[in-house]
Regions:
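A sequence-level detector for low-complexity, Ser/Thr- and acidic-rich stretches
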Residues: 2-6, 19, 23-140, 145-156
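Protruding loop/beta-arch "assembly-hinge" segments enriched in small, turn-prone residues
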Residues: 1-10, 175-196, 261-283
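Short, positively charged
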Residues: 11-20
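Small/polar beta-strand repeat architecture
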Residues: 82-115, 196-283
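A generic structural signal for short, non-catalytic loop/turn and secondary-structure boundary residues
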Residues: 70, 114, 142, 178-181, ...
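A structural signal for short, hydrophobic beta-strand segments that form beta-sheets
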Residues: 70-73, 77-82, 111, 171-199, ...
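Ser/Thr/Gly-rich low-complexity blocks that favor extended beta-strand/coil architectures
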Residues: 44-70, 149-177, 214-243, 251
Length: 283
């Protein structure tokens, strides 16, 4: 088995702080309203509710060309605590996630609220939906670009995820294009240990953004392409079972190998203004 395997998105995981400073586990404790009716999982982005001043999961919009600021965005959920009146352990218990409609008057969430926090997350395609776990792999060309949040929330009509983990991930813009406009996160690095690289040939000489390689196995949106005829870096935007389309046309050389590289996991930081501590608008 390849090591390590990325089986799906897992939310945002704190790694360190901008500048390489250590993350030592510091969190802010924020109340959750008793009976709050939505699931919150480990790694979900959370915000302050304008009506109650308590913690709720983020109301960020569906991924598109851009993704707007959500006032009150506080950080990432890292668990919670509240008292149980039914046991098995009485008094304050600690939980990895908040199950919708839990009744607990003393519920407190742990939030990674540092606006300079760096997170690790899984790369996803942009399908125009907030419920999407389709894999992407971002090439070096995405460094410094912006990414949008794919929440993949679990409906409160369903049981809370048994793992307690988020299914959120990050995607590029519409049609998987690089984003330079408004979006919550900035790419600051890549996780090399889980990066992908695949080589395949293109049988025919074609001048086009859409090419038909000998094999599409292992080729994902976001991958950077290198090989004959490519003088300016290009990256894959869309894939089908037999073709890939890049952001800029090139002339392929028949029978020549092309290499596709990309990271399944990226390192990101908050963009200025998207975290409430760096936004002058209050809640």
């Amino acid at each position: 088995m390849a090591y390590p395997t990325i089986s799906g998105p897992y939310g945002l995981v704190p790694v360190n702080l901008i500048g390489g400073r250590a993350f030592v586990g510091s969190t802010r404790m924020v109340p959750i309203r008793s009976g709050y009716s939505e699931h919150i999982s480990l790694g979900d982005v959370v915000q302050i509710d304008t009506a109650t001043g308590t913690l709720v999961r983020s109301a960020v919009g569906t991924p598109g060309a851009t993704q707007a600021v959500v006032n009150g965005t506080l950080g990432v959920f890292l668990g919670c605590e509240y008292s149980s009146s039914t046991g098995p352990i009485y008094g304050k218990n600690r939980y990895q996630n908040w199950a919708a409609n839990t009744v607990a008057a003393d519920a407190i969430a742990y939030v990674a609220d540092d606006p300079q926090q760096v997170f690790k997350a899984v790369a996803l395609t942009n399908t125009g939906s907030a419920s999407n776990k389709v894999q992407a792999a971002f090439g070096q060309i995405f460094l410094g670009s912006n990414l949008e949040l794919v929440t993949n929330y679990t409906s409160n009509t369903l049981a809370a995820p048994t793992s307690g983990n988020s299914s959120g991930g990050l995607c590029a813009g519409s049609s998987n294009a690089k984003v330079t406009a408004a979006a919550p996160f900035r790419v600051v690095g890549f996780v090399n240990e889980t990066a992908l690289s695949v080589t395949t040939s293109i049988p025919s000489t074609v001048t086009n953004a859409t090419q038909t390689p000998a094999s599409m196995t292992g080729i994902y949106p976001g991958m950077q392409v290198s090989g004959s005829g490519i003088t300016t870096p290009v990256y894959v935007q869309t894939v089908t079972s037999s073709t890939f389309t890049v952001n800029s046309s090139f002339t392929s050389a028949a029978g020549t190998n092309y290499t596709f590289t990309g990271a399944q996991e990226v390192l990101v930081a908050w963009n200025f203004g998207h975290h409430s501590y760096a936004n002058g608008t209050g809640v």
